[in-house]
Amino acid sequence: MNRKHVFDQTFFEKVDTEEKAYILGFIYADGCNVKHPTTAELSIAQMERDVDILYKIKDAIKSTYPISERKGDLSGDEKYFVFYIYGKHLGEQLNKLGVTQRKSLTLTFPEFLDDTLMPHFIRGYFDGDGSVWEGKRKKMVVKNDHRPGEYRERIVHNVKFNFTGSSTFIPYLQKYLIEKYGFSETKLNYSKAKDDHRHCTMEYSGRKNLYKLYDIMYSSATIYGERKKAKFEKILCALSEKSLSEMGLIAGTPETVISSEAEKSERSTTIPGMEVGGSLPKCPTLSE
């Protein structure tokens, strides 16, 4: 099999580029490194809606191995695709980078990565085991600070993102986001798995956190999953220009609703890279 197909066997000897960091992050989330008697097998499976990621990995690693279509045993009757690569040296490289044969029991945060590459690693992991969504919006009646005695309606956007993974990985990802990017500490949710290890979910809500994560992951990105980036931008673009102005992220009307001293403090906090002209998605609706 190895004689029929080729790939860049030195790809992971040194993780020193955006592509390598992103793909390593994705493999941390969704890859499987299996040792065989004479070789090793890297396998990555994705549903059809995210198959573009497999082709990007295939191109980056210069592989001639095919991406195979399957159906039935991953998620009901929906089609999915699997990318296999075989190589003993590749397996050894991934093992040294933390992708062991039973990584759900051993996976730890890759502190060996340079900070300049960490956003790409995080984006790769997010494309594998992260989610972003908007729940039902709510209306609140609040005081109008510019017109004493009057009230107005305020739309509360219920936007969230999360990362899921092992209990040996997610807490350290959160620690990095707190120390490097100023995220607050949130409660982590744990659940037991069949193989006696614990799954862990880290969830954040609020527009400010979404903009912050978007900027971290996509401000200089050239490789990413199309679907999740588009979903992220659809949610962000659904926030009106007025909402952005209230957050102090773009020029516009002054902030009109501050419900508490804590909220004042939160809103005055600078978001790295999110000043006026920062890395917001290009939304044609923002100026309407």
Question: Where in this protein do the model-derived segments appear?
Answer:
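Internal intein/HINT superfamily modules and their associated LAGLIDADG
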Residues: M1-E288
